[in-house]
């Protein structure tokens, strides 16, 4: 790839981060839970006077990056350290997205479900763009890949186990922090887990070819 194409792909990846973060913001605003990978940060952000969701996402992503370094050791590629500034950018985009959608009323349950569905669609679009960019993995996917490669396991199976582990950890944190009450992890989390992958596949079919043509020009 030429330097120009590489630059275009990184710009595309940053754009994908914005849409992914906006999708998270929509689901968060719906108050029915967020995607599994964001569920731990979401629970931690529910504490009064604590950090915002964006800040907790930065911290969570940095923990996952550290996990990659520990698992891969000498096999960890230095280029993957770019995940750190990109994690900060994702956290900022998430808080900005929450500000953007903050005016939308969510009093009714139907409206909350709508927010979750819209969030999943936007998140799916963002993830599909990041796949098309093909420059660097987000910290969650990279962490799963590190485990799968090291343990010689199927990526999809490890991803499912990782998502389930995130939800279980979020539930445990919620019970411990909020007097045995489940906070921040609800049916929206399950819906996101089941439907985000489908949205990504749909957008991949629609956008992969034109996006690749665009960045290759």
Enumerate the predicted regions with their spans.
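Core subunits and conserved enzymes of cellular information-processing
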Residues: 1-217
């Amino acid at each position: 790839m030429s330097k120009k194409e590489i630059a275009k792909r990184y710009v595309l990846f940053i754009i994908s981060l914005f849409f992914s973060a906006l999708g998270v913001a929509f689901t968060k605003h719906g108050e029915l839970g967020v995607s599994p990978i964001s569920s731990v940060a979401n629970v931690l952000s529910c504490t009064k006077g604590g950090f915002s969701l964006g800040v907790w996402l930065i911290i969570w992503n940095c923990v996952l990056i550290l996990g990659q370094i520990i698992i891969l050791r000498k096999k960890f590629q230095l280029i993957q350290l770019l995940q750190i500034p990109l994690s900060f950018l994702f956290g900022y985009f998430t808080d900005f997205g929450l500000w953007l959608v903050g005016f939308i009323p969510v009093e009714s349950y139907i409206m909350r479900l709508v927010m979750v569905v819209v969030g999943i669609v936007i998140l799916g679009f963002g993830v599909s763009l990041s796949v098309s960019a093909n420059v660097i993995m987000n910290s969650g996917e990279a962490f799963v890949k590190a485990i799968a490669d090291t343990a010689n396991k199927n990526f999809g199976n490890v991803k499912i186990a990782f998502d389930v582990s995130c939800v279980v950890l979020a539930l445990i944190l919620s019970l411990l922090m909020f007097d045995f009450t489940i906070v921040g992890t609800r049916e929206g989390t399950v819906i996101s887990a089941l439907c985000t992958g489908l949205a990504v596949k749909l957008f991949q079919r629609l956008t992969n070819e034109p996006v690749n043509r665009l960045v290759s020009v």
